[in-house]
């Protein structure tokens, strides 16, 4: 199991970040590895929403199927990964007294044997950590004037 965590302070209040974050279709605008996002059903927000995200990292391409299992505005959203890569993930927003927000992204991912299994998860975690730090930089830029 790969455990990943990246975090960044964003110069915006949690509610403003949540408003952007809750529009799931926009995640492809700031997530470099997300090539496309498709809703699996009519629901677009909240716990129970299901999505399929085509994820591309270098030559690798997988469809990441996720169900939102927690939706707690403006503090937390969490997913269960049920596609080729399984596990769980969450976004946490912690607003500071100065109005900025610490955004933390945590994941626990299990890779199938044909994607390298546990050794692949270790390598994948290192690569994803770098990619996700870049994602959080792009997300933070959405809130600069």
Regions found by a protein language model. Give the residues of each.
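Well-ordered beta-strand positions in beta-sheet-rich domains
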Residues: 5-9, 63-65, 88-90, 106
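Residue-level detector of alpha-helix boundaries and kinks
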Residues: 2, 12, 53, 78, ...
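Hydrophobic ligand-binding cavity/cleft-lining segments
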Residues: 1-41, 46
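Solvent-exposed residues in well-ordered beta-strands and their adjoining turns
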Residues: 9-13, 54-58, 69, 94-96, ...
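Glycine-rich portal/gate segments that line the openings of hydrophobic small-molecule binding cavities
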Residues: 26-28, 38-88, 98-102, 134-145
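Beta-strand/loop substructures that line and gate deep hydrophobic ligand-binding cavities in soluble
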Residues: 80-133
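Amphipathic alpha-helical segments that line or abut small-molecule/effector binding pockets
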Residues: 15-18, 133, 137
């Amino acid at each position: 199991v790969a455990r990943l965590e990246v975090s960044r302070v964003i110069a915006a209040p949690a509610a403003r970040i949540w408003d952007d974050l809750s529009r799931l279709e926009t995640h492809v605008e700031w997530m470099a590895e997300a090539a496309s996002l498709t809703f699996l059903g009519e629901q677009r927000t909240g716990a129970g929403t299901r999505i399929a995200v085509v994820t591309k990292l270098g030559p690798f391409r997988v469809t990441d199927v996720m169900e939102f299992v927690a939706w707690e505005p403006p503090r937390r959203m969490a997913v269960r990964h049920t596609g080729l890569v399984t596990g769980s993930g969450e976004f946490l927003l912690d607003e500071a007294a100065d109005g900025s927000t610490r955004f933390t992204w945590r994941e626990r991912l299990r890779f199938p044997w044909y994607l390298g299994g546990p050794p692949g998860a270790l390598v994948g975690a290192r690569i994803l950590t770098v990619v996700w730090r870049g994602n959080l930089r792009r997300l933070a830029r959405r809130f600069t004037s």
